[in-house]
C-alpha cells in the first residue's frame, strides 16, 4: 500500500498527515528533503492542467529524496514532528526566500555531501549506482529548480499536489524498527578496546572450550599411552628378571675367556666348533695366566640396573698337553704356577686339565725301554698327590683325547653358568640319594618342596605318612626343638611326645604314630655325636644324662 504526502501552501498547517500503516514493511521508508528557499507557488484551480512533480521513494538503497518546497521556516519547525512522524524529512530553509545566502549554500553543500556518502550498513555498490542516477548540481541550488526534475519521474495525474509515491508495493519494516535496527547494528560492531558482544563472546568461548577439551582429551590419551607403555615395559623387565633369576638366560650370558696358547694346540679347532654348536660366547686373547680359561657373566642391559653387582664365577682351568705338562713337572715349575694362580685369584677354584698324559708317559717308557736314553719319567704321581694334600681348591682332570677335552670344557662352561642360579644347600637339605621317598607316594611333591619333611623322611624307618603327621603338628623343626629343649619336661616325656599323633592308615582309618617312631625321632634330632649310627642311637648310645642343661 502506497502512502502519499500532500504538500500545499494553502492547506492548514494544523491538518495532520495521513498516518503510516502499522504493517511491517519490506524496505525502509525514504526520507524527504524539503527546501523552502523558493517563493511559495500559487495554488492552481482544480481544472487547470498542471503537471505535478512526483517524487517517489527511492527504489535503491538510499533513504533520502529531495523535494523543493516553500514551507515557512517557523511553521515547518513547529509542525515537523507532528505532520511528518514516520517520515524522515530534512528541510533546507533560509530566512530570505529570494536571495541565497552563504549560510544556506554551506548548509546545502553539507547536506548534499552527506547524500553522496553511502549510508552506514548498506552496500557501497548500490549507493554508487544511486548517486550516478540522481546527480544534483551543487552550484546555485537556491535559484535553480531544475534539479528537482532530474531526480523525479513524470506522470500525468490531475492533482495539483506534489505526491510522493513509493515504487515498492509492500514494505515490511517500520521506521521505528529501522531506527532500532540501526541502533543495534551500530552497537554490535566491534570497537577496538571494548568488550566483544555476548553472542560472539559465547561463540568464541564455545570454540575455546572445545579446543581445551580436545587438548585435554589428547593429553589424557597420551598419558594413558605412556602409562600403558610403562606398564608393558615394567612387565617385560619383570619377566626378564624372572628368567634371569631362574637361570634361563645363563648360557647366553656366560663368556669364556680363552688364552691364545690353548687354541694353538691340537684341541683348538674342535673346541671352537663345540662352543659354536652350544651358542656360547667366547673371547680369545692373552690371559694373565698362560694356557688358562676363565669365565665371566654379562647381565642383559635391560635388567643390569637391578643387579649392580653381577655374578662372579670363581673358577680357573689350566689346559696342558702331555709333553708340556711333563716338562713343567720335571723342571719343578708346575707347583710354582699353581702358587702364582692362587696368589692372583685367592678365592678361585683351580683345575689342571691334561690331554693324553698317561698314554704319553707309557709311550715314552716303551721307547726308553727299547732305546735307552736320557729321558726319565717325571714325578707326576707325587705332584698330583701334592695338589690334593697341600693345596686348597686345586684338583686335576685327565682326558684321553681332544674330543674329551673339548666336551669337558664345554660341559664345564654350561655347569658354571647354571650353578650360579641354583638354590644353595642348607643344613636341612638332603641329597637325592638320601631322600627315601617312594615314587608312588601321594605326597612326594609336598615332601620335595619342604626341607623339614625331607629331614624327617631321611631318618631311617620314618615313613612319609609318619613325617606328614609330625609336620601337621609341628610345621617347622624350630617348633619341635623348642619343645625338646624345654627344661620343665623330662627325657621320658620328650621321647614319647609324638606317640599319640594320628597317622593316616594304608587301608583307611587312623593309627597312632607309636612309641618306637617317637623315640627314634627324638634321639636322632637331639644326638650330640653325629658319627654314631642310627641303630646305636635307638639302642641308647649317646644318651643324654651327662649332657649339661638336659634333664
Swiss-Prot record:
Chain coiled-coil ranges: 203-253
InterPro entries: EME1/EME2_C (IPR042530), ERCC4_domain (IPR006166), Mms4/EME1/EME2 (IPR033310), XPF_nuclease_EME1_plant/arthr (IPR047524)
Pfam families found in the cross-reference section: EME1-MUS81_C (PF21292), ERCC4 (PF02732)
Domain ERCC4 residue range list: 287-484
Assigned EC number: 3.1.22.-
Record-stated family: Belongs to the EME1/MMS4 family.
Record-given protein name: Crossover junction endonuclease EME1B
Species: Arabidopsis thaliana
Organism classification: Eukaryota, Viridiplantae, Streptophyta, Embryophyta, Tracheophyta
Gene behind the chain: EME1B
Amino acid at each position: 500500500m502506497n502512502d502519499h504526502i500532500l504538500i500545499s501552501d494553502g492547506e492548514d498547517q494544523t491538518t495532520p498527515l495521513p498516518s503510516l500503516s502499522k504493517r511491517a514493511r519490506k524496505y525502509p521508508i525514504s526520507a524527504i528533503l524539503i527546501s523552502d528557499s523558493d517563493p511559495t507557488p500559487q495554488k492552481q484551480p482544480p481544472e487547470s492542467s498542471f503537471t505535478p512533480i512526483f517524487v517517489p521513494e527511492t527504489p535503491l538503497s538510499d533513504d533520502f529524496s529531495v523535494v523543493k518546497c516553500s514551507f515557512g521556516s517557523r511553521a515547518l519547525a513547529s509542525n515537523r514532528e507532528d505532520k511528518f512522524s514516520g517520515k524522515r524529512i530534512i528541510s533546507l530553509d533560509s530566512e530570505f526566500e529570494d536571495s541565497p545566502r552563504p549560510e544556506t549554500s554551506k548548509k546545502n553543500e553539507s547536506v548534499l555531501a552527506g547524500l553522496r556518502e553511502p549510508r552506514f550498513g548498506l552496500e557501497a555498490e548500490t549507493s554508487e549506482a544511486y548517486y550516478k542516477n540522481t546527480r544534483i548540481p551543487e552550484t546555485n541550488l537556491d535559484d535553480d529548480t531544475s534539479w528537482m526534475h532530474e531526480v523525479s519521474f513524470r506522470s500525468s495525474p490531475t492533482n495539483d499536489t506534489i505526491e510522493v509515491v513509493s515504487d515498492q508495493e509492500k514494505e515490511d519494516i517500520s521506521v521505528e524498527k529501522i531506527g532500532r535496527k540501526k541502533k543495534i547494528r551500530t552497537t554490535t560492531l566491534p570497537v577496538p578496546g571494548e568488550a566483544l558482544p555476548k553472542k560472539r563472546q559465547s561463540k568464541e568461548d564455545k570454540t575455546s572450550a572445545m579446543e581445551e577439551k580436545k587438548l585435554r582429551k589428547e593429553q589424557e590419551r597420551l598419558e594413558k599411552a605412556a602409562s600403558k607403555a610403562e606398564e608393558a615395559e615394567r612387565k617385560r623387565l619383570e619377566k626378564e628378571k624372572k628368567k634371569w633369576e631362574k637361570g634361563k638366560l645363563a648360557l647366553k650370558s656366560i663368556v669364556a675367556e680363552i688364552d691364545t696358547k690353548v687354541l694353538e694346540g691340537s684341541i683348538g679347532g674342535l673346541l671352537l666348533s663345540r662352543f659354536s654348536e652350544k651358542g656360547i660366547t667366547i673371547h680369545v686373547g692373552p690371559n694373565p695366566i698362560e694356557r688358562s680359561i676363565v669365565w665371566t657373566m654379562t647381565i642383559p642391559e635391560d635388567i643390569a640396573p637391578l643387579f649392580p653387582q653381577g655374578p662372579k664365577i670363581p673358577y680357573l682351568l689350566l689346559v696342558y698337553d702331555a709333553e708340556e705338562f711333563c716338562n713343567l713337572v720335571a723342571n719343578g715349575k708346575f707347583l710354582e704356577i699353581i702358587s702364582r694362580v692362587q696368589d692372583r685369584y685367592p678365592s678361585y677354584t683351580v683345575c689342571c686339565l691334561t690331554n693324553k698324559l698317561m698314554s704319553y708317559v707309557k709311550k715314552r717308557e716303551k721307547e726308553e725301554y727299547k732305546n735307552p736314553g736320557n729321558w726319565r719319567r717325571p714325578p707326576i704321581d707325587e705332584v698330583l698327590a701334592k695338589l690334593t694334600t697341600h693345596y686348597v681348591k686345586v684338583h686335576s682332570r685327565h682326558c684321553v683325547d681332544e674330543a674329551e677335552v673339548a666336551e669337558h670344557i664345554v660341559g664345564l662352561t654350561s655347569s658354571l653358568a647354571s650353578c650360579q642360579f641354583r638354590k644353595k644347600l642348607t643344613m636341612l637339605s638332603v641329597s637325592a640319594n638320601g631322600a627315601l621317598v617312594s615314587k608312588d607316594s601321594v605326597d612326594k611333591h609336598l615332601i620335595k618342596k619342604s626341607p623339614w619333611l625331607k629331614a624327617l623322611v631321611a631318618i631311617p624307618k620314618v615313613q612319609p605318612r609318619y613325617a606328614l603327621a609330625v609336620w601337621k603338628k609341628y610345621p617347622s623343626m624350630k617348633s619341635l626343638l623348642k619343645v625338646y629343649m624345654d627344661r620343665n619336661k623330662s627325657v621320658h616325656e620328650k621321647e614319647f611326645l609324638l606317640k599319640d599323633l594320628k597317622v593316616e592308615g594304608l587301608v583307611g582309618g587312623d593309627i597312632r604314630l607309636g612309641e618306637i617312631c617317637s623315640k627314634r625321632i627324638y634321639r636322632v634330632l637331639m644326638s650330640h655325636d653325629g658319627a654314631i649310627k642310627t641303630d646305636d642311637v635307638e639302642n641308647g648310645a649317646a644318651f643324654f644324662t651327662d649332657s649339661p642343661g638336659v634333664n
